[in-house]
């Protein structure tokens, strides 16, 4: 009996599989290099414990540190709210000097300051911010915006939370918002 011939189509799978794997690794590598984060695909925010949380309600500022009542509640609620985002690209709006001055006098905003950078694990370079500003009431409020900053400067290109409700619920429970 003559030797069995292998069907030719089976030999095509291996080069196609190697080619597809190479393309996949190349795409992963490009995104990892551009985002400066090899775990960009996780899509979960690594939120370090804040040094301080500042809540500003109509110009009145409340400073919370790790031993303050309500600190843990706000931190956990912020972790939940920042667990997913509506889009994977930052929006183009930023915080003008006028908006920041308005936040000093009216509305409700939440600011968090960290000693370690926040890592959003996104497929672009998130800048590794050490401060977050979340408008709750007033300009830019009600849209789930999260502004990032570092070194006393706020950056253009806010992220949009998918569900800010845990944060709103915590602020209401602590008396910073009215139902």
Predicted feature descriptions by range:
Residues 2-179:
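Function-determining sites in protein domains
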């Amino acid at each position: 009996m003559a030797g069995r011939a292998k069907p030719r189509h089976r030999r095509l799978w291996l080069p196609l599989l190697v080619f597809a794997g190479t393309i996949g690794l190349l795409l992963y590598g490009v995104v990892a290099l551009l985002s400066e984060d090899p775990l960009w695909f996780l899509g979960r925010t690594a939120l370090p414990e804040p040094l301080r949380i500042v809540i500003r309600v109509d110009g009145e500022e409340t400073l919370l540190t790790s031993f303050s009542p309500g600190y843990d509640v706000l931190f956990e609620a912020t972790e939940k709210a920042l667990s997913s985002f509506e889009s994977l690209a930052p929006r183009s709006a930023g915080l003008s000097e006028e908006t920041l001055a308005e936040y000093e006098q009216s509305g409700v905003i939440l600011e968090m300051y960290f000693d370690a950078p926040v890592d959003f694990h996104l497929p672009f370079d998130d800048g590794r911010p050490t401060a977050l500003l979340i408008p709750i009431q007033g300009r830019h409020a009600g849209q789930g915006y999260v502004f990032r900053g570092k070194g006393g400067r706020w950056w253009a290109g806010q992220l949009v939370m998918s569900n800010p409700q845990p944060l709103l619920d915590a602020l209401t429970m602590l008396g910073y918002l009215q139902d």
